[in-house]
From Swiss-Prot:
InterPro entries: Ribosomal_uS10 (IPR001848), Ribosomal_uS10_CS (IPR018268), Ribosomal_uS10_dom (IPR027486), Ribosomal_uS10_dom_sf (IPR036838), Ribosomal_uS10_euk/arc (IPR005729). The lineage of its organism: Archaea, Thermoproteota, Thermoprotei, Thermoproteales, Thermoproteaceae. Part of the 30S ribosomal subunit. Involved in the binding of tRNA to the ribosomes. One of its GO terms (biological process) is translation. Keywords: Ribonucleoprotein, Ribosomal protein. The gene is rps10. GO terms for molecular function: structural constituent of ribosome; tRNA binding. It comes from the Archaea. The keyword Nucleus does not apply. This is Small ribosomal subunit protein uS10. GO terms for cellular component: small ribosomal subunit.
Length: 106
């Protein structure tokens, strides 16, 4: 396979369920290794914490009590030196609704 037909692809996975993100990353790495492609990753990126603090009581009366809600966004990064054939196979992987994928050609 010539160098012109191979491209470096950066895959970013992110989602609210870390087990789903890890499962999709593992499937991508396993598929790439089975196809004989050079893989780097999955590289865990920092988890982003989104916090929202809301007042429990709708009125201003009573004690000042608050609820804290948190959402964590887990991210993984995978670099693959892939051909068009490998990219087509990557598109067939089943991805849960909680995981989002970004592909970037480098």
């Amino acid at each position: 396979m010539s160098l012109a037909s191979r491209r470096k692809v950066r895959i970013r996975l992110y989602g609210t369920n870390p087990t789903d993100v890890d499962q999709v990353a593992r499937e991508i790495v396993d598929l790439a290794k089975k196809m004989g492609v050079q893989v780097r990753g999955p590289i865990p990126l920092p988890t982003r914490r989104l916090m929202v603090t809301v007042r429990r009581a709708p009125s201003g009366q009573g004690y000042h009590t608050f609820d804290h809600w948190e959402m964590r966004i887990s991210k993984r990064l995978i670099d693959i030196e892939a051909s068009e054939r490998v990219l087509r196979r990557l598109m067939t992987i089943r991805v849960p609704d909680t995981v989002k994928i970004e592909l970037q050609l480098i």
